[in-house]
Amino acid sequence: MKQILDFIPLIIFFALYKMYDIYTATGALIIATAIQLVVTYALYKKVEKMQLITFIMVTVFGGMTIFLHDDNFIKWKVTIVYCVFAAGLIIAHILGKPVIKGMLGKEVTLPDDKWAKINHAWVLFFTVCAIANLYVAFEMPLDVWVNFKVFGLLGLTFLYTLFTGMYVYKHMPKEKKEEQE
């Protein structure tokens, strides 16, 4: 259920962009993301930091997009969010508080060096996505960027999550693998 909630604002953004324009879609994205936060809190009594950061960025950059009638701001939002996530993972790693281990460590047991590799891999992933977004956003037509944002980055994230899961499974202790099967 929670994963479905995460995609609703993006689906609304895409649909309204195709029906109207980037400004209508951006306004709807802001509203849908706010509703998503409220619903998430109502259902789970908690809002994750990533959701909160995304909401703040959507509101700030989306607001500037609408207010200044300049779609460059919403394009920059994607890159900045990815950079914030990458920086957050780096800082957490330096401080000895690995975020990904914190998210998955309750269900999955891995050696610390494997958690560090996963962390570094996600830093690299977020950095590559940020750079790719910059290229597509500012070198391609708006339609291409919207499709890339909705389908390209989402697809890449899904694949990377799948590869991460495969890596985790490969390095799980044998007794944990047997429990999973």
From Swiss-Prot:
Pfam families: IspA. It is found in: Cell inner membrane. InterPro entries: YciB (IPR006008). The keyword Transmembrane helix applies. PANTHER family: INNER MEMBRANE-SPANNING PROTEIN YCIB, INTRACELLULAR SEPTATION PROTEIN A-RELATED. Plays a role in cell envelope biogenesis, maintenance of cell envelope integrity and membrane homeostasis. Belongs to the YciB family. This is Inner membrane-spanning protein YciB. It comes from Aliivibrio fischeri (strain MJ11) (Vibrio fischeri).
